[in-house]
């Protein structure tokens, strides 16, 4: 959190020392000095960043430092739910592209407002219909940006993911990725607007927006078949490991510095071959490993033990 401005876990309460009213983290490095202070007041947690004695409630993008997290749940993403895959892809792109991050936040706010309006449906109200159409236009604008950027990101980086996978697997393979847009991408905005119009009655009944990026998914193919159907457990985890190594490469390119790598009990999910390949890949980076197995300790590492 002190480096990137937010916790990977999402909840500030998870970052607090148990039963403590205040938690302070103090870091010093070639990036300067920074502290983050969390105060629990009447059940609400307040966050404050102190960077070289300058205080702020948020960490601006220019003060964020690149961090890449490897965690077990991401290695199981292929067999997980579409919503988990969407969150993974959105987070990956947003950490690299400030415009996408802003569009994603605006899209989620617009989706929430549109759903609230659907739930407050008023029969024969022209004002209500006009309001909904206005939200339709705004929703479609952000939805188009999100869907097209997701698809473009996967298309551009598919060859790199394939190469990384082959390096990890030690063999050539047929790997491809397809973004499952709910309407054609080439005229996404107009097609989505038409789709919403046709779904109006259904959406009024359910109170939810039935189409858009929040209902879309991407599929990974291995040997021209969905990986979820034909890939072994080890192959699935190798594919997701390739995604994370892609993030490591892209973060390095964007930030012009080597990211800090966090390995959260990941080695327990890998066999000996993939563990060795991962260690070789990250050996020139600074990394922090959490593990319950002493075999994963590397020479020259500082070790902090907890019981």
Each model region followed by its residue ranges:
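Switch/connector loops and helix/strand junctions flanking conserved nucleotide-binding motifs
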Residues: 33-35, 78-79, 186-187, 296-299
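A conserved P-loop NTPase coupling/switch region
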Residues: 58-64, 71-137, 141
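Nucleotide-state sensing region of NTPase/ATPase domains
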Residues: 2-84, 93-96, 100, 158, ...
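Residues that form or immediately flank small-molecule/cofactor binding pockets and catalytic motifs
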Residues: 20, 72, 180-182, 292
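C-terminal lobe/lid and adjacent interdomain/linker elements of RecA-like ASCE P-loop ATPase modules
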Residues: 32, 39-43, 273-307
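DNA major-groove recognition helices of helix-turn-helix
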Residues: 1-2, 246
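Walker B catalytic acidic pair
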Residues: 264-266
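Conserved NTPase motor "head" modules and their coupling/switch loops across ABC/AAA+ ATPases, GTPases
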Residues: 127-260, 269, 273, 277-280, ...
């Amino acid at each position: 959190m002190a480096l990137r401005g937010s916790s990977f876990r999402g909840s500030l309460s998870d970052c607090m020392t148990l039963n403590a009213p205040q938690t302070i983290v103090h870091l010093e490095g070639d990036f300067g000095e920074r502290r983050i202070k969390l105060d629990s007041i009447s059940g609400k947690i307040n966050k404050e960043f102190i960077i070289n004695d300058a205080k702020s409630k948020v960490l601006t993008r220019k003060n964020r430092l690149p961090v890449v997290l490897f965690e077990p749940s991401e290695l199981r993403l292929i067999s997980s739910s579409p919503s988990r895959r969407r969150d993974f892809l959105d987070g990956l792109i947003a950490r690299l592209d400030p415009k996408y991050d802003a569009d994603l936040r605006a899209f989620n706010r617009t989706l929430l407002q549109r759903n609230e309006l659907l739930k407050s449906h008023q029969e024969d109200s022209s004002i209500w219909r006009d309001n909904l159409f206005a939200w339709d236009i705004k929703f479609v604008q952000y939805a188009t940006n999100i869907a097209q950027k997701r698809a473009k990101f996967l298309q551009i980086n598919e060859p790199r993911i394939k190469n990384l996978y082959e390096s990890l697997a030690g063999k050539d393979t047929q790997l491809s990725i397809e973004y499952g847009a709910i309407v054609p991408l080439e005229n996404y905005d107009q097609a989505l607007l038409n789709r919403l119009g046709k779904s109006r009655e259904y959406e009024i009944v359910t109170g939810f927006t039935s189409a858009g990026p929040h209902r879309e998914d991407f599929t990974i193919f291995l040997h021209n078949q969905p990986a979820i159907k034909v890939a072994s457990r080890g192959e699935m985890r190798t594919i997701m490991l390739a995604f994370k190594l892609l993030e490591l490469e892209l973060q390095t390119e964007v930030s012009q510095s080597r990211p800090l790598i966090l390995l959260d009990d990941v080695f327990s999910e890998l066999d000996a071959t993939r563990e060795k390949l991962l260690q070789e890949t990250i050996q020139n980076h600074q990394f922090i490993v959490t593990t319950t197995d002493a075999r994963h300790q590397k020479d020259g590492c500082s070790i902090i033990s907890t019981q």
